[in-house]
Amino acid sequence: MKKVVIDGNNLTIEDVVKVARDKWEVVLSEVAKERIVHSREIVDRYVKEGKVVYGITTGFGKFSDVVISKEDTEALQKNLIMSHSCAVGDPLPEEVVRAIMLLRANALAKGFSGVRLETVETLIEMINKNVVPVIPEKGSLGASGDLAPLAHMVLVMIGRGEAFYAGERVSGEEAMRRAGIPTITLSSKEGLALINGTQVMSALGCLNVYDAKRIIAVADAVASITLEALRGIIDAFDDRVQMVRPHKGQIVSAKNVRKMVEGSELITRQGEIRVQDAYTLRCIPQVHGAVRDAISYIERVLGVEINSATDNPLIFPDDGEVISGGNFHGEPVALAMDFLSIALSEIANISERRIERLVNYQLNDLPPFLTEKGGLNSGMMIAQYTAASLVSENKVLSHPASVDSIPSSANQEDHVSMGTIAARKAREVLKNVTTVLAIELLTASQALEFRKGFKRGKGTDRIYRLVREKVNPLVEDRELYIDINACFDIIRSGRIEEVLKEEGIMLE
């Protein structure tokens, strides 16, 4: 079994994907175990001495001024989980929940949360035995962290709630019993430590940014096919043009396109057919590149967040102190996820306009809507409608969630991030972008049917042939949703990158 070792400091987004999607085993490092035990000693001492510490011997939120007796500290934590299990909506996908559990375990592994070692080990065992809590997708304000959804995760740990196990939705108690995992009784501070963090938005964020990195490379490849089908001008992709405005993403996108069309007889030079192309072709490096740079920034934000202690209060065992702070506030992730939605929407925006240039005979020398029997057949006409619909939907979804805030807990928690809403929206935007690119891939491949007799580029030809393995050329009208879905699957499966790699073309 392949393993990911967590220590609270070195988890990567790639590690998250390995655990979430590929079901790699999670192992807690020995150093992390020592830190967890050391941190727990401070909590036990404070409880024994009867010190007043938020979340350990007090209530929560506006009830932080209510002192809880030593005898009631365990009941306090159980009540916290029960009362906070208020999330609603459809269950989050399994891959997201597995990522959530991994990120929470990694945050606890830093040793600033004061939980018992057995509690962290229970969470890890649930990951390894694929006990997946049913976590409804809606209900988080993104500060204090993802309280409501994370409470549903903890319900299963204490033998309540619901979970998916072995393909069935069962009670949390049954899932734990069938997996052979003992349920736990929460001790002082543990309920709070398990739910007061940004792990839901961060889990969504990690999967979003991982997929976005793939999509931007695919967008370069798909745009290259359109460039070729429209006999675009390669001069705009010259490295010298990029180097006098040396944004890294722009340089990479131009390089990717040059790789794709190498050897093409369809690609033209400036002045050969046209002096210059429309912006949707000529500015591919500038637009795609800016999105690539945005994704790199977002990746850095998440890289910090997934290796952070995000609960409250924090235990500093070396100093013997417990400090209340605000690391649960999801603003860094909220802004990053809103940025991701905006950036990805631009990929769909420019892709849809390239689709229009492919189907609009007034903008090219191809048959209207890429069908030879126009009138009797509508060809690719309505595929562009679908792309336009998705682009417009993305414009709504890209309205930032982070600009909103509603005070809660009797105005004690008077500013929140809405980071999980931002992350959920970004996931939907990503699906729409992938579909728009699938429509462009389908449409550009159809356009190439009218460019017979010209040699295609090394990369574009390979992808064209990949499409034709799944989708026949459009001769007469048929149900295009089948073709769109086939191209969507080609993109999502990673086959584009695989076949290009076989040709020695490595997209960055």
UniProtKB/Swiss-Prot annotation:
One of its GO terms (molecular function) is histidine ammonia-lyase activity. Keywords: Cytoplasm, Histidine metabolism, Lyase. Pathway: Amino-acid degradation; L-histidine degradation into L-glutamate; N-formimidoyl-L-glutamate from L-histidine: step 1/3. There is a cross-link at A143-G145 (5-imidazolinone (Ala-Gly)). The keyword Cytoplasm applies. Contains an active site 4-methylidene-imidazol-5-one (MIO), which is formed autocatalytically by cyclization and dehydration of residues Ala-Ser-Gly. One of its GO terms (biological process) is L-histidine catabolic process to glutamate and formate. It is found in: Cytoplasm. The modification 2,3-didehydroalanine (Ser) is found at S144. GO terms for cellular component: cytoplasm. It comes from the Bacteria. NCBIfam families: hutH (TIGR01225), PRK09367.1 (NF006871). Belongs to the PAL/histidase family. This is Histidine ammonia-lyase.
